[in-house]
Amino acid sequence: MAADTLSASILEQDDPQLIQEGAPAYLLLLDGFISRNPEDTALLAAGAQLYALYGSRFAADEQRAIELTTKARRYGRAALCLEHEWACSLELGGYETYVEQLSRVTRRDIDLLYAYAVSWLSYLDATSDDWTAVAELPWVEAALQRVLALDDTYANGAVHGYLGTLNALRPPALGGMPEVSQAHFERAIELSEGRDLGVKVEYARRYARLMFDQELHDRLLTEVLEAPADAPGLTLFNALAKEDARRLLATSEEYF
């Protein structure tokens, strides 16, 4: 209950600056709950996702982002490990063994697996200058693919948005799969009924810019700016998406 209440109070805010200034108090409170209940997997999963969000979007500098997402990663790992002993050594073998072990995660544990994947991805984003981070991306993608296999509608299809981004990181000439990226973004929009504005922003930023499709780029961003930000569990993300959409649209002519 405490984890749900804390998460909701942050995600329902439509003022990113207020969250930037006030969220550290929530994170400290959540840390306190976790220290008193170190085996509460729901609290750990909530901590993983909130630290991932704050580290990715509100950290003051690169080093701070690394520190915050490192904690997110630690919480995400701990939650899955506490639920399944075999998960404690999940990353110690090779990639093939890792993927095989992921198949043991069931629908009952989808919250934990999602938090594990998202917190890892936030850490890799914060350390993207490190080639080790690049090498770990397939591991995160495999975890997200497992979430997808368990329930592709989970979190209003947010996992499709992440997979859309991952599949657009490389151009076709370097082995990228833009058609797969586009399919994921379209599915994410469908599942959220267009309410997840962040998906449209990433669709424009990652896919449309990669493919030099200005018409799609500008249409998606205009839709974001014209849409309401308020949506259950998405209000903060949508407010941030609107900020990003304004910046991207302002540089459209220059980019294309």
List the predicted regions and their residue ranges.
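An amphipathic alpha-helical core segment
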Residues: Q182-G194, K200-M211
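Outer-membrane beta-barrel transmembrane domain signature
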Residues: N167-E190
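N-terminal alpha-helical interaction modules that lie
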Residues: M1-G157, R170, E190-R195, R209-F256
